[in-house]
């Protein structure tokens, strides 16, 4: 679940304290007792890369739309009243940064900045170097603990009490940092590289799936299809009626996330050239306002209704609440003139609107920093 910090400065102060305490106390009170100068140097290089990546993740602007931007013809025409400009695809207005953010992933309390198109590589490198450094450090700690245990009965004082104290404190702390950051890193990699989605887009997919299974999505998609592609359903009234009444349609047959090409292309889109992946100042070279889409999103007038729905821009419901159609039967019984009368009424299932919907992690749009008032 997304974390909200009461005092924003704490979001930066806590990581700075943990990096300094774990890294430098380990260096001076544990590692210097048994590592070579070369090994200590490499550890400090890795620790320095954490600081550089963290600094870039904090101060690099995540990216904002250029003035005068206009969406393409078959994209949603979303206008931000606060920035007074049209929002490109995948863009959201951050309430805390007070700007529209290109490919907004989330507002990170630990950097006091949004994670977006321009600084996502710095954020990922920050996580990577934390994992690399704490992983190496945990290896050294375990090695030293093993040495201490094997020589616990030695007459010579091979390990000082001071070193034992810091080993006891730093080992579980280092393991905790490694575990939590690894989980966050895996989540980011799964979303952005495997599925080609930001965390907000992954949340959006869950919300749309919820609408689908509550039978509020398909009528809205058909309405949007006629809006984006006028005349797309002309003369197909019978097919539309059969499509709505059919219960065999699956979620994947009508919903396509257009920015998921393949893991390699997804990786290049969010991290840039492989030569820049570990470059502390590297990043993608595109403008972050127009993106390549997969073949499934190509519109063809001659295809079926399902295939046409797959060509809708993201999100396919245009963030609308969805149109309800009969989904739950409510049977009422009454007696009239000595005869029992049965009435079957259809009651639409209530679904919270987008700005009030929560996923299974307990996250709403506000948890990601999105300004729901201008969405």
UniProtKB/Swiss-Prot annotation:
<feature type="transmembrane region" description="Helical">
    <location>
        <begin position="34"/>
        <end position="54"/>
    </location>
</feature>
<feature type="topological domain" description="Cytoplasmic">
    <location>
        <begin position="55"/>
        <end position="121"/>
    </location>
</feature>
<keyword id="KW-0564">Palmitate</keyword>
<feature type="topological domain" description="Lumenal">
    <location>
        <begin position="31"/>
        <end position="33"/>
    </location>
</feature>
<dbReference type="GO" id="GO:0019706">
    <property type="term" value="F:protein-cysteine S-palmitoyltransferase activity"/>
</dbReference>
<keyword id="KW-0808">Transferase</keyword>
<feature type="topological domain" description="Lumenal">
    <location>
        <begin position="143"/>
        <end position="164"/>
    </location>
</feature>
<comment type="similarity">
    <text>Belongs to the DHHC palmitoyltransferase family. PFA4 subfamily.</text>
</comment>
<dbReference type="InterPro" id="IPR039859">
    <property type="entry name" value="PFA4/ZDH16/20/ERF2-like"/>
</dbReference>
<feature type="topological domain" description="Cytoplasmic">
    <location>
        <begin position="186"/>
        <end position="375"/>
    </location>
</feature>
<protein>
    <recommendedName>
        <fullName>Palmitoyltransferase PFA4</fullName>
        <ecNumber>2.3.1.225</ecNumber>
    </recommendedName>
</protein>
<feature type="transmembrane region" description="Helical">
    <location>
        <begin position="10"/>
        <end position="30"/>
    </location>
</feature>
<feature type="active site" description="S-palmitoyl cysteine intermediate">
    <location>
        <position position="108"/>
    </location>
</feature>
<keyword id="KW-0472">Membrane</keyword>
<feature type="domain" description="DHHC">
    <location>
        <begin position="78"/>
        <end position="128"/>
    </location>
</feature>
<feature type="transmembrane region" description="Helical">
    <location>
        <begin position="122"/>
        <end position="142"/>
    </location>
</feature>
<comment type="function">
    <text>Mediates the reversible addition of palmitate to target proteins, thereby regulating their membrane association and biological function.</text>
</comment>
<keyword id="KW-0812">Transmembrane</keyword>
<keyword id="KW-0256">Endoplasmic reticulum</keyword>
<keyword id="KW-0449">Lipoprotein</keyword>
<dbReference type="InterPro" id="IPR001594">
    <property type="entry name" value="Palmitoyltrfase_DHHC"/>
</dbReference>
<feature type="transmembrane region" description="Helical">
    <location>
        <begin position="165"/>
        <end position="185"/>
    </location>
</feature>
<dbReference type="Pfam" id="PF01529">
    <property type="entry name" value="DHHC"/>
</dbReference>
<dbReference type="GO" id="GO:0005783">
    <property type="term" value="C:endoplasmic reticulum"/>
</dbReference>
<keyword id="KW-0012">Acyltransferase</keyword>
<dbReference type="GO" id="GO:0006612">
    <property type="term" value="P:protein targeting to membrane"/>
</dbReference>
<dbReference type="InterPro" id="IPR033682">
    <property type="entry name" value="PFA4"/>
</dbReference>
<dbReference type="GO" id="GO:0005794">
    <property type="term" value="C:Golgi apparatus"/>
</dbReference>
<dbReference type="GO" id="GO:0005789">
    <property type="term" value="C:endoplasmic reticulum membrane"/>
</dbReference>
<feature type="topological domain" description="Cytoplasmic">
    <location>
        <begin position="1"/>
        <end position="9"/>
    </location>
</feature>
<keyword id="KW-1133">Transmembrane helix</keyword>
